[in-house]
Swiss-Prot record:
Family: Belongs to the aconitase/IPM isomerase family.
Amino-acid positions noted as binding [4Fe-4S] cluster in the UniProt annotation, renumbered to this chain: 388, 451, 454
Signal peptide boundaries: none
Record field: transmembrane: none
Catalytic activity: citrate = D-threo-isocitrate; (2R)-homocitrate = cis-homoaconitate + H2O
Entry GO CC: cytosol; mitochondrial nucleoid; mitochondrion
InterPro entries: Acnase/IPM_dHydase_lsu_aba_1/3, Acoase/IPM_deHydtase_lsu_aba, Aconitase/3IPM_dehydase_swvl, Aconitase/IPM_isomerase, Aconitase_4Fe-4S_BS, Aconitase_4Fe-4S_dom, Aconitase_dom2, Aconitase_mito-like
Region (Disordered): 524-555
Main localization, broad class: mitochondrion
Protein name listed in UniProt: Aconitate hydratase, mitochondrial
The enzyme's E.C. designation: 4.2.1.3, 4.2.1.-
Induction or repression: Down-regulated under iron limitation conditions.
Keywords attached to this entry: Amino-acid biosynthesis, Iron, Iron-sulfur, Lyase, Lysine biosynthesis, Metal-binding, Mitochondrion, Transit peptide, Tricarboxylic acid cycle
Primary gene name: acoA
Species per Swiss-Prot/TrEMBL record: Emericella nidulans (strain FGSC A4 / ATCC 38163 / CBS 112.46 / NRRL 194 / M139) (Aspergillus nidulans)
């Protein structure tokens, strides 16, 4: 059920209690303790006392119950006394506790930080090497190859992190989000990360938000971070899962209800008695995939399952400290949500979502019919489990139990089957406890502890590009061509349990809840429902040491960037606005339909250029469909009349000193946090991106780089814009809460005006005028 009115939690249901009981008011002595955020850093403490004091100020001002999401945000306000607070409207200035960067986005973030001229980061920061390892032959061989071909980038990251007091996780350590959950996330905290799936950490009751590199640089430099106060969507869970239903099915169901843009501008807050039946890592899975519905972040209230996970990962002292602050690590009685969804876990079916979009949700009982009705390729070519979304000990244990059931009947995977451990700790633990051996005997290829096929780092050989085929993964995202660069691949996402089951059958036309298989002797049998412990009974095995702490003396550390490098390039500042309206400028491309960050700045083979802005700009918008001809990467140059690639045409306009705009459709920039999708159009001379609507992170990234993200005040005006028109953009009209004018000059016909809306505030307008947020920072600091 979905309720779209303001929903008062306390009036709708009894408040689900913490299993260990809710304590009364914490004393000052309780909150005065010095408890470090993690075991790997010294001197960085959890400040529940300051959070509590900030909340007291806000409570006196608002005089109403607060959601848990609000508590975290308001407890991290830079100025709780004077901050305007209105959900969905105010811009909050916040002080995050941590920053995390993955290696593909860290390069540009650190290059920007270097240009700010500071000696070290002002906020605890880590960098994680997980995106640049391509899946080819298997874990160790792929890791060795990655270390060789990415040596220049890894050396840059290792030296720059050492120079600027940043923790560094080496290649092979694991995926950023799993490392954060295992080491850094803590209840009640606020962190940002340069990856859209940063909300994964919400499984430990922290508000973890994906941002672009420019936002990360602000926080690394000690500046407040700005976020439009999100609305809060409540998801109330009742009942308890059993059998083949997994935590993944909760978010697959929610994605189907809310769609890829239904969470935009909102935090998803899970609550209710059903929460206590989920493991901490199961909650992390749900929070991770909240990115697919556009949510700012997702989170759960602190409970005993989280305490158990903190204890298992050698952070019991954090769990004990959190218990002293427990009353503010959950929603208040009577807290109101802008929208409420209710899900009975006892009735929830396993789901499979896709293809081509993560919000096309189909219950397993209806999936065969959907396959037939839509003509999706029935044969399952590849099953893939793991990734940041589903690679916990519980996930791997349940998957191995199904694989063992098949092996006991003389069966192995019919489909190609791959396993991606989420971290070195997970890999070492499941190797010790036997799950890895079972999955290998089942036919699994064990990939490196890295992102791999989930982000397109997959040198796939079993089908030719352009050949229709089906793959099923436990990943989070399944946009066209994302995993294997084949636009004809039908990619579906589901739980690891169903991936294993379908891989045994080798077909999409299999429902393990009702269908039978034939064993080696031809006898029919049904797979047993998966089983597996949430935490290892013998504790976690940390495996190899893959962490590099910054040295105590950093004065002698040099960061070298070769001027001849094709992977790394020092940044030059963007030019400030000239103070004039832009007249007679071309529309570079009018994008038709879904235009994700994968369409704007592809990953896969382009990841190696993430530290070199000019080189990676050669992939700008090459995946976007041109509304003029229905083709990708084929647009008309208004000066030559010739058709060419989007980046080449943009470079020609830039060489002529001509600015340009892009016209976009709904939810433009959906997907990842990659700021390259904003840096590239700015670098190649773009002025504005004008759309029906934006995804949150991309809109902010464009503002940070001095671009104008604008929306049609009337979305129907998108259809009125001829792709070959020229336009005037009246930039001098830019003001808070005021519309702007786009004057359209069709090639044939009379000119007409279109009204444009925007979400700029005063400080963001400064970014545009100065040329970028980084320029504004430099101007104000005198650098």
């Amino acid at each position: 059920m979905i309720t779209t009115r303001l929903a008062r939690m306390g009036a709708l249901a009894p408040k689900s209690r913490l299993l260990f009981g809710t304590r009364g008011m914490a004393t000052v002595a309780d909150l005065d303790k010095k408890v470090e955020m993690c075991n790997l850093e010294k001197g960085n403490y959890i400040n529940y006392k300051k959070m509590s004091e900030n909340l007291d100020v806000v409570r006196r001002r608002l005089t109403r119950p607060l959601t848990y999401a609000e508590k975290i945000l308001y407890s991290h306000l830079d100025d709780p006394q004077n901050q305007d607070i209105e959900r969905g409207k105010s811009y909050l200035k916040l002080r995050p506790d941590r920053v995390a960067c993955q290696d593909a986005t860290a390069q540009m973030a650190i290059l920007q930080f270097m240009s700010a001229g500071m000696p070290s980061v002002a906020t605890p920061t880590t960098v994680h090497c997980d995106h640049l390892i391509e899946a080819q032959l298997g874990g160790e061989k792929d890791l060795a190859r990655a270390n060789e071909i990415n040596k220049e980038v890894y050396d840059f990251l290792a030296s720059s992190t050492a120079k600027y007091n940043i923790g560094f996780w080496k290649p092979g350590s694991g995926i950023i989000h799993q490392i954060i959950l295992e080491n850094y996330a803590f209840p009640g905290g606020l962190m940002i990360g340069t990856d859209s799936h940063t909300p994964n950490a919400g499984g430990l009751a922290i508000a973890a938000i994906g941002v672009g590199g420019a936002d990360a640089v602000d926080v690394m430099a000690g500046l407040p971070w700005e976020l439009k106060a999100p609305k809060v969507i409540g998801v109330r869970l009742t009942g308890e899962m059993s059998g083949w239903t997994a935590p993944k099915d909760i978010i697959l169901k929610v994605a189907g209800l809310l769609t890829v843009k239904g969470g935009t501008g909102a935090i998803i807050e899970y609550h209710g008695p059903g929460v206590n039946s989920l493991s901490a890592t199961g909650m992390a899975t749900i929070c991770n995939m909240g990115a697919e519905i556009g949510a700012t972040t997702s989170l759960f209230p602190f409970n005993d399952r989280m305490y158990d996970y903190l204890k298992a990962t050698k952070r019991q002292q954090i769990g004990d400290f959190a218990r002293s602050y427990a009353k503010d690590l959950r929603e208040d009685e009577g807290a109101e949500y802008d929208q409420l969804i209710e899900i009975n876990l006892s009735e929830l079916e396993p789901h499979i979502n896709g293809p081509f979009t993560p919000d096309l949700a189909t219950p397993i009982s209806q999936f065969k019919e959907a396959v037939k009705a839509n003509g999706w390729p029935e044969e399952l070519k590849v099953g893939l489990i793991g990734s940041c979304t589903n690679s916990s000990y519980e996930d791997m244990s349940r998957a191995a139990s199904i694989a063992q059931d098949a092996l006991d009947h003389g069966l192995k995977a019919k489909s190609i089957f791959t396993v991606t451990p989420g971290s070195e700790q997970i890999r070492a633990t499941i190797e010790r406890d036997g799950q890895l051996k079972t999955l290998e005997e089942f036919g699994g290829v064990i990939l490196a502890n890295a992102c791999g096929p989930c982000i397109g780092q997959w040198d796939r050989k079993d089908v030719k590009k352009g050949t229709p085929n089906s793959i099923v993964s436990s990943y989070n995202r399944n946009f066209t061509g994302r995993n294997d660069a084949n636009p004809a691949t039908h990619a579906f996402v589901t739980s690891p349990d169903l991936v294993v089951a379908l891989s045994i059958a080798g077909t999409l036309n299999f429902n393990p809840l009702t269908d039978t298989l034939k064993d080696k002797d031809g006898k029919e049998f049904k797979l047993k429902a998966p089983t597996g412990d949430g935490l290892p009974s013998r504790g976690y095995d940390p495996g190899r040491d893959t962490y590099q702490a910054p040295p105590t003396d950093r004065s002698s550390v040099d960061v070298a960037v070769s001027p001849s490098s094709d992977r790394l390039q020092l940044l030059a500042g963007f030019q400030p606005w000239d103070g004039k309206d832009a007249t007679g400028i071309p529309i570079l491309i009018k994008c038709q339909g879904k235009t994700t960050t994968d369409h704007i700045s592809m990953a896969g083979p382009w990841l190696k250029y993430r530290g070199h802005l000019d080189n990676i700009s050669n992939n700008m918008l090459i995946g976007a469909v041109n509304a003029e001809n229905g083709e990708a990467n084929k647009i008309k140059n208004v000066f030559t009349g010739e058709y060419g690639a989007v980046p080449a045409t943009a470079r020609d306009y830039k060489a002529r000193g001509v600015k340009w705009v892009v016209i976009g459709d709904w939810n433009y920039g959906e997907g990842s946090s990659r700021e390259h999708a904003a840096l590239e159009p700015r670098h190649l001379g773009g002025l504005a991106i004008i759309t029906r609507s934006f995804a949150r992170i991309h809109e902010t990234n464009l503002k940070k780089q001095g671009m104008l993200p604008l929306t049609f005040s009337d979305p129907a005006d998108y259809d009125r814009i001829p792709p070959d028109a020229t336009v005037d953009l009246l930039c001098t009209e830019l003001a808070v809460d005021k519309p702007m004018t786009l004057r359209v000059h069709p090639k044939d016909g009379a000119s007409f005006d279109v009204k444009l809306s925007h979400t700029f505030n005063e400080s963001q307008i400064e970014w545009f005028k100065d040329g970028s947020a980084l320029n504004t920072m430099a101007r104000k600091s005198g650098n």
